[in-house]
Swiss-Prot record:
Name of this chain's protein: Phosphopantetheine adenylyltransferase
Principal location: cytoplasm
Assembly with partners or alone: Homohexamer.
Organism listed in the record: Lysinibacillus sphaericus (strain C3-41)
A Gene Ontology term for the protein's cellular component: cytoplasm
Length: 163
């Protein structure tokens, strides 16, 4: 029997508890989960791809079936390269669904053998985004309940609040 492989893509700039929840839930369902840290040329990231990968590796180290990699090409090509049969995306709101449906439709057009699975975020993460975390952290406010400890520290260092 072949392994069930999935890809969880995102910029993860930075990784939040919402992202981590989706990754953990995907890891419960699939044999191997590739977390694809995307290098999106349309975004101006706070953290480099290498920094985001290191933070992701730290926060997922207790998940033995999760692999952290980066990708800068088409997601569907990355999924095919990894022999994934699924792309897993987290949804917070209806607005997320509309955007994700466009991406899913294009991915299906490019390769109809790879399915997209949407996982609804837990209620406590429904408002959470990396952009909101960065905005709050930039002004020195507490983000301990939004991101893992290593991310809190990395944000403090980026914004000059470290001891």
């Amino acid at each position: 029997m072949s392994e069930k492989i999935a890809v969880v893509p995102g910029s993860f700039d930075p990784v939040t508890f919402g992202h981590l929840d989706i990754i953990k839930r995907a890891a419960d369902v699939f044999d191997i989960v590739y977390v694809a840290v995307l290098n999106n040329s349309a975004k101006n990231p706070l953290f480099s791809v290498e920094e985001r990968m290191a933070l992701m590796a730290e926060v997922t180290k207790a998940l033995p079936n999760v692999r952290i990699e980066s990708s800068s090409g088409l997601l569907i090509d990355y999924a095919k390269e990894k022999k994934a049969k699924a792309i897993v995306r987290g949804l917070r709101a209806v607005s997320d669904f509309e955007y994700e449906m466009q991406i899913t439709s294009m991915n299906r057009f490019l390769d109809e053998t790879i399915e997209t699975f949407f996982i609804m975020t837990k209620n406590q993460y429904s408002f959470l985004s990396s952009s909101i975390v960065k905005e709050v952290a930039k002004y020195g406010s507490d983000v301990n309940e939004l991101v893992p400890d290593c991310v809190v520290q990395a944000l403090k260092e980026k914004y000059g609040f470290s001891q």
